[in-house]
């Protein structure tokens, strides 16, 4: 199917400015990257900015295109039963380049046994593009009658509710959910901000020595997953209260494991994804990722929800984020008799670092310079600085019950460096930031602190203070010296503040 198409397909492809079969740019045909040798000026004035990828190039390479096979070599030797259940594939899109959507369809049809692929459902989350209305309808009706169905939202619903709509339209016993900018071709973890990342597979999988074996994974990337249709219904689908983008994939991972299921990455699956430089849904993706993370934390993470608030550097009480009503999701958890998040950490994601010893966290301000906050400064400098307060994670401080004062983003998993400690080494007048386990005496990293009081080194008795300096940024620098009356505050308290 990759080697040619009918004349009628060729005519229709040309009518919408696209190229099928073996015609078009030769680059990119034989599993190699494609570039435009003589790119023409984009008449629309910035499609790359619009789509977050090179749509001009996409429009000039064939719709039938293979990708490199990066799977373990043993995958090519594997065989599968002929009686696998039929599958519905749901593609979600909004304002996608037409050629990218059609290439996803071609790739899926070309690489999937026909008796397994029952239907393809395209969910248009209220796109603005004319191309994605008449031209898309015309193309799929002509080329894939009965196989490809289009469902359209009358308003922009966001990825989560668009996927739920696709599930409702599906009729096969197995449903696969994919972004529409994919080709058919490590385990997936996440940080305490509930942001997905790749992690090393569990040691048990590594010890097994079989690179083709399924990998137990705590969560998943949201752009490609496959699930039994009825099971997905029984565990509550995706959370329809999630807005726009982010978090739904992490929430599903926690829910599946805590409620008696399992989640796996299949190394022999072959799916490639175009990572867009710009998301089409909203310019404020960080806000919705934060909102959805808090929503998941409130339902599934028990007392560990404080870690999510900490990771985003916002207060637990009155965080300034409306994550909506979670009562129905809490009722679902109770109905399904799901396990605790503590069980999940111990049995599914033991690589997560926990910060239960935190007393207070957030911005640290000094009475002498209240508009400036303690900041980790450049990563390679190992020196804390004062910087105008902005609330980002470089100004996330944590004071622990042991007396550590740590500064910078949480080292959420053992795959990442842990947050550094503020240290008074007793030499000179400047404190340093060091790996907590790397100090010569443990007392050098310990401090006494009370809210609206001094920060005192337990090792030297000197106080962390601020002094004016022409050489320092913003005219202020941190020093350790005899107490001069300066006071400090840390914004957020998990345990009652000590005065």
List each language-model region with its residue ranges.
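Active-site-adjacent helix/loop segment of glycosyltransferases
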Residues: 262-356
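Active-site nucleotide-sugar/metal-binding loop of Leloir-type enzymes
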Residues: 109, 142, 164-174
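A recurrent flexible, glycine/aromatic-enriched loop bordering the glycosyltransferase active site
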Residues: 160, 192-226
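Lectin-like carbohydrate-binding module/patch detector with strong preference for beta-trefoil
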Residues: 344, 350-499
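A short, conserved alpha-helix in the catalytic core of glycosyltransferases
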Residues: 219, 223-236, 241-269
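N-proximal low-complexity "stem/linker" segments adjacent to membrane-targeting elements
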Residues: 1-110
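Short beta-strand-to-loop acidic/aromatic patch adjacent to the donor-nucleotide binding site
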Residues: 172-182
